Regions:
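Conserved alpha/beta-domain cores
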Residues: 1-118
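C-terminal active-site-proximal or functional interface alpha/beta core segments in diverse enzymes
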Residues: 78-179
C-alpha cells in the first residue's frame, strides 16, 4: 500500500517493527493531556516526554528508524495553549536527540483537534493558530510539520442522528451509548 511510516507509543509496539526495519520507520507519539478537550486523546495514546530518549535508544538498538515525533492533544480543543506547550517540549526533544546523536527527528505531527462551531462560538481558525505558528518557529531548522485537521475539514459537512440507548458518568463527564 506504500505506507512506510507508523506511529508507536511504547516499547512493545516499537519492537514489532524490528522485522520490518528495512522498509518502515516510526514516529514516537507523546502524551500531552488536555482535560478541556471534548475527547482527551492523550489519555489513551502517547508516552510521557521522559520516555522519548529511552525509546530512541531502544529503536537504535533494534535498527528501527525514528523519523520524528507525534502528538494529538485531543478533539475539539478550545484553546491553543496545549499545542504551544507540546511543540515546545518536542522542540527540546528534537534538539536533544540531535545533539546526543541518537536520531535526526525531521518530522513533527501536531495532530488535529482544531475546533469547529457546534452551535456555540469559537475562535476563528487564524486566531486559534496564531500562537501555534509562533511556537513552530522554535523548532530546529528543517523539521517538517504535518497536521491532522479531520474534524475541522469534515465536521461541517454533515449531521448524524442517532438514538441514545444508554449513558454513564465517568470522571465527572457523561458518556452516551448510541444505537
Amino acid at each position: 500500500f506504500g505506507i512506510r511510516t507508523f506511529v508507536v507509543d511504547n516499547p512493545d509496539e516499537l519492537r514489532k517493527f524490528h522485522p520490518h526495519r528495512a522498509r518502515a520507520a516510526v514516529l514516537l507519539r507523546l502524551s500531552f493531556r488536555d482535560p478541556t478537550a471534548v475527547v482527551d486523546l492523550s489519555r489513551k495514546f502517547g508516552c510521557e516526554p521522559a520516555a522519548v530518549v529511552p525509546m530512541l535508544e531502544l529503536a537504535r538498538s533494534l535498527g528501527v528508524k525514528v523519523r520524528g515525533l507525534s502528538f494529538h492533544v485531543g478533539s475539539q480543543v478550545a484553546e491553543p495553549k496545549k499545542y504551544v506547550e507540546a511543540i515546545g517540549v518536542c522542540a527540546e526533544l528534537i534538539e536533544q536527540a540531535s545533539a546526543s546523536g541518537l536520531a535526526n527527528l525531521a518530522l513533527l505531527d501536531i495532530g488535529g483537534g482544531f475546533p469547529i462551531a457546534y452551535g456555540g462560538t469559537i475562535q476563528p481558525i487564524r486566531e486559534f493558530c496564531r500562537p501555534i505558528r509562533q511556537a513552530l518557529k522554535t523548532l530546529p531548522r528543517g523539521v517538517r510539520v504535518i497536521a491532522e485537521p479531520g474534524r475541522f475539514i469534515a465536521g461541517p459537512s454533515g449531521t448524524s442522528i442517532s438514538t441514545v440507548v444508554g449513558r454513564a458518568q465517568r470522571e465527572g463527564r457523561w458518556w452516551y451509548y448510541l444505537d
